[in-house]
């Protein structure tokens, strides 16, 4: 640790000038070697010993991360590096590779400017490699490539130097294929990786060595030399000594990752919504430490001693202890109590943190991931702040959680709330009437690890078997449906119809929201969403969570503005619990076509109008060919070629479909789609049994799909039974009134 302590003060000095800073992340498919690579960088920085690098997992500071050997949360570290006489302060973010934790990856990408994408040379480019690279490109983060586990090609697969070179060239080609597919035109060509310009390195994180073209030329090393060294020494100790991996990686970073000033000049265009205020926009684009304070929050963590620790990037201005700030999303004024930089699990206090740095802040107790923090003095100039962080996964698996001791219930709810604050892909629903607590996550492992956190708090509870989250939608357009309020003095007429894919995509991607002015909103919906002009002009409410619209198509209705908020709340209630099975509604347009509102406010309050709206929408949806949508995973199985038949057979048995098979030397990759419902419970055991444990697979959320008719009624009744609802499917007529 001595060597490390010496550079702390110097690092802090370097961080005062953004030109010295490089903000980077290491991203990859699960088990391709990110954390082992990070440990090598820590070793070079003097944080851990060389011998421990590769096995210490220093950035995995969760106990369960150490046990499972996977990274769950994103941890931060700052490194000192010198190249050609120039000094760098390199802020490194380690991110998870397991698909269930991509929410943490997405948030990490917001604060970094370059990403080292790690690819296992045996497995090559996999489903998660594609996911994280696409996410990086969407956030305008420059990708670099490290091809890992070359030792396995030599020792296990016994490939010749020529075969290894062919494999590396194929990985580079496939990786550049991702940049071609997902990169923006202005970055596509210049961000493609090339061996010639040192934007690609290969090596072995486990054995601590790495090579770029320049290092190979400088040290006169050829492929055949590496093979010879492994033949003499299976641990490749000479390679660790002569070509340490940290030099290859940090050389790549120093050469190709932009400093925050350069990066923000093109990233802020994509990340910042409010472009009208030129002074703010320019301060952000220029990464101006003297500009107004603007910070983007990417993570919230609960520290057992310090409480809520907010991590984010200072895009403009300087963070100072004691300063009053305003949280744009939470609409709250708060005071910064302490400012620090991260060193793995430790925070090193810095009284001032200028633009371009990643900071840890105490005092922002109302912040959540995606929050925009600004100096209190400029709060009225910021309309909506940073673009919403878009997550590629959705919470599609749910469990019911019940405290064994009723006295523990408040503590259980509080602990789960804190977890959801830290993890945006985790959703808790507490039914006040029944006392039931539901926890939704992206997969079984995600929920298992989240509940492990709760057990660590000393709470005992029972957990149900995992079930799938469904969505309700409609396939047709209803006739106009009338519903009266309970006192019969108010009338609501509505229709229901499906939204087109373009509009759903606009809502999902955050390109339309209620914070936009009505003229801009209508223009985007009409031009990009191909929406009817009158509908686009009259959107009352956007359900950003489930992608639905409430549209006012009434003409000349008296007192409508006075009850608008009540009608809106009724709409949002139904969108959370649809008519078929009380599941969230997705992709539906509800049009209010007429209304009769009583003149006396006492007769038109929420107790009268909310049930009327709910009843009308239920009737309309049930008469518009209602459907249940089920979540579908994309599945990718890595298997020996002789087991392809078994893998295809199992996927087919589970209502899945295979869409492609790719040969990669001695392994084959089977790609397909499979309903999430079919992967719960025994799927892992069945796959292991049919392939004798020789197949490896990963799933990621892909899309929603209507349940087959043969299954829909059965599943709807199952859900209704589980929720204690009436065990028969509702009929539209039950919710329709007549004049």
Curated annotation (Swiss-Prot):
Signal peptide: none annotated. SMART domains: EFG_C, EFG_IV. Residues 19-261 form the tr-type G domain. It is found in: Cytoplasm. The keyword Protein transport does not apply. GO terms for cellular component: cytosol; ribonucleoprotein complex. GTP binds at residues 28-35, 94-98, 148-151. Disulfide bonds: none annotated. Keywords: Cytoplasm, Elongation factor, GTP-binding, Nucleotide-binding, Protein biosynthesis. HAMAP family: EF_G_EF_2_A. This is Elongation factor 2. The lineage of its organism: Archaea, Thermoproteota, Candidatus Korarchaeia, Candidatus Korarchaeales, Candidatus Korarchaeaceae. The gene is fusA.
């Amino acid at each position: 640790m001595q060597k490390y302590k010496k550079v702390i003060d110097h690092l802090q000095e370097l961080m005062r000038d953004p030109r010295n800073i490089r903000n980077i992340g290491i991203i990859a498919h699960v088990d391709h070697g990110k954390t082992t690579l990070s440990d090598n960088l820590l070793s070079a920085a003097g944080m851990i010993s060389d011998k421990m690098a590769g096995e210490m997992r220093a950035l995995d500071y969760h106990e369960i991360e150490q046990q499972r050997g996977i990274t769950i949360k994103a941890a931060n570290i700052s490194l000192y590096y010198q190249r050609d006489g120039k000094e760098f302060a390199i802020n490194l973010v380690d991110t998870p590779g397991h698909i269930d934790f991509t929410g943490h990856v997405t948030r990490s990408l917001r604060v970094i400017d370059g990403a080292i994408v790690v690819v296992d040379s045996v497995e090559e480019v996999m489903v998660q490699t594609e996911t994280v690279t696409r996410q990086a490109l969407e956030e305008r983060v420059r990708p670099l490539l490290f091809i890992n586990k070359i030792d396995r090609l030599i020792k296990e697969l016994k490939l010749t130097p020529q075969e290894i070179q062919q494999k590396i060239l194929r990985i580079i080609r496939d990786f550049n294929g991702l940049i071609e597919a997902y990169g923006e035109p202005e970055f596509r060509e210049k961000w493609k990786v090339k061996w010639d310009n040192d934007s690609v390195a290969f090596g072995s994180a486990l054995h601590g060595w790495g090579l770029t073209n320049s290092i190979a030329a400088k040290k006169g090393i050829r492929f055949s030399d590496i093979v010879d060294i492994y033949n003499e020494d299976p641990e490749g100790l000479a390679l660790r000594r002569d070509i340490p991996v940290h030099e290859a990686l940090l050389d790549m970073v120093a050469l190709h990752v932009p400093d925050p000033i350069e990066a923000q000049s093109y990233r802020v265009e994509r990340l910042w919504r409010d472009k009208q205020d030129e002074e703010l926009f320019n301060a952000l684009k220029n990464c101006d430490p003297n500009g107004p304070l603007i910070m983007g929050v990417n993570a919230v963590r609960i520290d057992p001693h310090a409480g809520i620790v907010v991590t984010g990037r200072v895009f403009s201005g300087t963070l100072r202890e004691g300063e009053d700030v305003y949280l744009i999303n939470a609409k709250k004024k708060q005071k910064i109590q302490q400012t620090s930089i991260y060193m793995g699990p430790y925070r090193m206090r810095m009284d001032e943190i200028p633009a371009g740095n990643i900071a840890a802040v105490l005092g922002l107790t109302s912040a959540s991931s995606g929050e925009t923090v600004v100096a209190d003095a400029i709060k009225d100039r910021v309309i909506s702040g940073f673009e919403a962080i878009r997550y590629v996964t959705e919470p599609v698996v749910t469990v019911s959680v019940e405290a064994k001791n009723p006295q523990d219930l408040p503590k259980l709810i509080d602990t789960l709330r804190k977890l959801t604050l830290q993890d945006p892909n985790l959703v808790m629903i507490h039914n006040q009437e029944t006392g039931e607590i539901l926890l939704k996550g992206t997969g079984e492992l995600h929920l298992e690890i989240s509940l492990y956190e709760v057990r660590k708090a000393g709470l005992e509870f029972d957990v149900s078997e995992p079930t799938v989250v469904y969505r309700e939608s409609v396939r047709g357009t209803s006739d106009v449906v009338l519903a009266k309020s309970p006192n019969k003095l108010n009338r609501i007429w509505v229709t229901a119809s499906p939204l087109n894919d373009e509009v759903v995509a606009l809502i999902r991607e955050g390109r339309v929201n209620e914070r936009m002015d009505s003229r801009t909103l209508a223009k985007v919906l009409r031009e990009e969403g191909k929406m009817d002009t009158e509908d686009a002009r009259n959107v009352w409410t956007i359900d950003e969570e489930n992608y639905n619209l409430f549209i006012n198509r009434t003409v000349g209705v008296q007192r409508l503005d006075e009850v608008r908020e009540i009608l809106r709340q009724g709409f949002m209630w139904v969108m959370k619990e649809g008519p078929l099975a009380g599941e969230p509604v997705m992709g539906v347009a509800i049009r209010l076509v007429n209304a009769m509102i009583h003149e006396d406010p006492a007769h038109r309050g929420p107790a009268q109008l909310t049930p009327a709206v709910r009843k009308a929408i239920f009737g309309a949806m049930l008469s518009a060919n209602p459907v249940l949508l089920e979540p579908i995973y994309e599945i990718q199985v890595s298997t020996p070629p002789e087991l392809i038949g078994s893998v295809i057979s199992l996927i087919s048995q589970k209502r899945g479909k295979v869409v492609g098979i790719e040969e990669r030397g001695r392994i084959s990759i089977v790609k397909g789609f499979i309903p999430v419902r079919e992967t719960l419970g025994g799927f892992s055991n069945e796959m292991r049994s049919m392939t004798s444990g020789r197949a490896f697979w990963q799933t990621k959320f892909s899309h929603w799909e209507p349940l087959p008719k043969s299954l829909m009624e059965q599943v709807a009744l199952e859900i209704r039974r589980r929720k204690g609802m009436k065990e028969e499917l509702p009929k539209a007529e039950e919710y329709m009134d007549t004049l």
